[in-house]
Swiss-Prot record:
Pathway: Amino-acid biosynthesis; L-tryptophan biosynthesis; L-tryptophan from chorismate: step 5/5. The lineage of its organism: Bacteria, Bacillati, Bacillota, Bacilli, Lactobacillales. The keyword Transmembrane does not apply. It comes from Streptococcus gordonii (strain Challis / ATCC 35105 / BCRC 15272 / CH1 / DL1 / V288). This is Tryptophan synthase alpha chain. The keyword Zinc-finger does not apply. Tetramer of two alpha and two beta chains. One of its GO terms (molecular function) is tryptophan synthase activity. PANTHER family: TRYPTOPHAN SYNTHASE ALPHA CHAIN, CHLOROPLASTIC, TRYPTOPHAN SYNTHASE, ALPHA CHAIN. It catalyses: (1S,2R)-1-C-(indol-3-yl)glycerol 3-phosphate + L-serine = D-glyceraldehyde 3-phosphate + L-tryptophan + H2O. CDD domains: Tryptophan_synthase_alpha. Its EC number is 4.2.1.20. The alpha subunit is responsible for the aldol cleavage of indoleglycerol phosphate to indole and glyceraldehyde 3-phosphate.
Length: 259
């Protein structure tokens, strides 16, 4: 059974459009999680393809300073895995959502209960950046009968043989990491990045989205040439926190990208 997230993104591809995923931090709002529905509606109205939602964690190894600070603000609003799932169960959206979480919060929740409870939400994908491929079976068997896709991250330093291993069981999409390091570190792309992404795109059977450091319309154009779309996090998280209204025009243009 092909997962809903894969089908949704493949439909966007067939329409000749670039896939655009904004990242937001759950609970990073003056109303805490009570503001989540408002933020999702704002993004949905701008035409985004799906939305990645971060669950805050006290030791976020993959997060740059902007997202780390957003996580701290969210924790200050007492956001937890339980409270996020409860909020998502009340949410009305047509968009598939993806949760990006470290392993510890969902382990504390109970993996089986977490997967079961997400079945009553619009969440269709999971990204767990600190779960090694070799340990994927901690959660993968629980997803077999669910509509949740476990999304792999493929870095620049991943060799071809390892890439093939990572993507052969992948569902939803492939998260191609554009930089070595943490999120939000823009302007320091490797010279062979486009070639790396193009090769990954050639061997993947599901959409490949480029993230980490993507922050300009030039980036959006560049990475839509060599992958199926982009994920933008730090730029959006910062703008939402600062109430920078200009972010709407950026999101709308990036989300409307035509191949």
């Amino acid at each position: 059974m092909t997962k809903t997230l894969t089908q949704h993104l493949e439909t966007i591809k067939r329409e000749g459009k670039g896939i655009f995923l904004p990242y937001i931090m759950a609970g990073d709002h003056e109303k805490g999680l009570a503001g989540l529905a408002e933020t999702i509606a704002f993004l949905e109205n701008l035409g985004v393809s799906a939305i990645e939602i971060g669950l805050p964690f006290s030791d976020p190894v993959a997060d740059g300073p902007v997202i780390e600070e957003a996580g701290l603000r969210s924790l200050g609003h007492h956001t937890s895995a339980k409270s996020l799932v409860a909020s998502l169960q009340k949410l009305d959206t047509q968009l598939p959502l993806i949760i990006m979480t470290y392993f510890n919060p969902i382990f504390q929740y109970g993996l089986k209960d977490f997967v079961k409870d997400l079945a009553t939400t619009p969440v269709k994908g999971l990204i767990i950046p600190d779960l090694p491929y070799e340990h994927r079976n901690f959660i993968l068997p629980l997803l077999e009968d669910s509509d949740l896709a476990l999304i792999p991250l493929v870095s620049l330093t991943t060799g071809l043989e390892r890439q093939q291993e990572l993507i052969k069981e992948a569902e939803g999409f492939i998260y191609a990491v554009a930089i070595n390091g943490v999120t939000g570190k823009s302007g320091s792309y490797r010279n062979d990045l486009d070639q790396h992404l193009s090769k990954l795109h050639d061997i993947a059977e599901i959409p490949v989205l480029t993230g980490f450091g993507v922050s300009t319309l030039e980036d959006v154009d560049r990475f839509n040439q060599v992958s199926d779309g982009v994920i933008v996090g730090s730029k959006i998280v910062k703008a939402l926190h600062e109430k920078d209204d200009s972010i709407a025009a950026f999101i709308q243009e990036a989300a409307a990208y035509k191949k």
